[in-house]
Amino acid sequence: LDKYPIKMKTDFNHCESLYWVFTQLCNDQCDHCYNLSGPKGARISEEECMAIIENMPDRVDRLILSGGEPLADRKLLYAILDRLRDRYAERTQIMLQTNGDLLTEPILATLIEKGVSRFDIASIDRYHKHAGARLEVLAELFEAHGVRGDHKDPLIDKDSYLIENELSWGYWGATEDMWLGGNWARGMALEKGIWKRDPQHNFCTILSGARNFLGGYDDIPQEISIQLWRINPCCPGTKFPIGDARTERVADVLERVSRHPVFKKLNEGDPWRMGEHLGISEAEARKRTEVLQNVCLYCDAFFEENMQDLNRERFIELPVLQ
């Protein structure tokens, strides 16, 4: 866990990688989906999305738009791309994560015109409807528009998380050999019982986990996640979000939690030590995880028992007394 440690960053108005699920609407409904996306998936308004963009850090190296299926909410996607271009111009690389089912020649041309420079086809697995059946068609489509396929793998390393001066695409899916190592205990995967049962597997210490969400490591990019409006230190999300991107500046939220002992440990990718300041030893945490069979489920239990101050649903607005 101490591999490549450096001093934690202090400029939270700069984010190397921001992963934003702006919609959970999807044309598919996969058994492994971690956020319950589908034809009736949750959505937020264009007004809320514009507020979220306004509250993003002033500097973002790359911004990954995902879902759901972004192309299933195309009008909103286009509005988001236009606003992102107004705010960041060419200073930010815009990347789109899609299952590729709805991608056509006119849509691809529009996406490129609106500033998308990286396309990730994240559906090459047994869970998706087409499971890569369109891959050859998509390859021809990308080639016709000058989108290079030299960088097929997901961009997860610090030295390759950006691709300079070219359009590119890649493809991958929820397979056992992907960098995550299995399905998070979230959403449909949790309901269907196909989440990874391995108490030793630390989702937290790899990209898409919480490690480096506040900076401090130079082997993976510093990345945060926004699930609709919920600001999270990781893609699967903590039990309670660390902030609301509709009403709070992301930089302020990160600066606030950077002083908290729980989030310092999560930033180190070490969830089993996040309760030490409360008298919960690493040995106790690991023993609890053995029972729960998954580190994300241990994290959920810890937050439920010790982090209720972040639970936005517990606040009840009381009537004003006259």
Model-predicted regions and their roles:
Residues 147-205, 236-291:
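C-terminal accessory region of radical SAM enzymes
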Residues 111, 116-127:
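Non-cysteine beta-strand/loop elements that form the S-adenosyl-L-methionine
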Residues 210-231, 247-322:
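Auxiliary Fe-S-binding modules of radical SAM enzymes
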Residues 1-98, 102-114:
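Conserved alpha-helical substructure of the radical SAM core
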Residues 85, 89-99, 127-163:
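Short acidic, glycine/proline-enriched helix-loop-strand junctions
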Residues 32, 36-39, 135, 241, ...:
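Secreted/processed peptides and extracellular or luminal domains of membrane proteins
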Residues 26, 30-33, 234-235, 293-299:
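Short cysteine clusters
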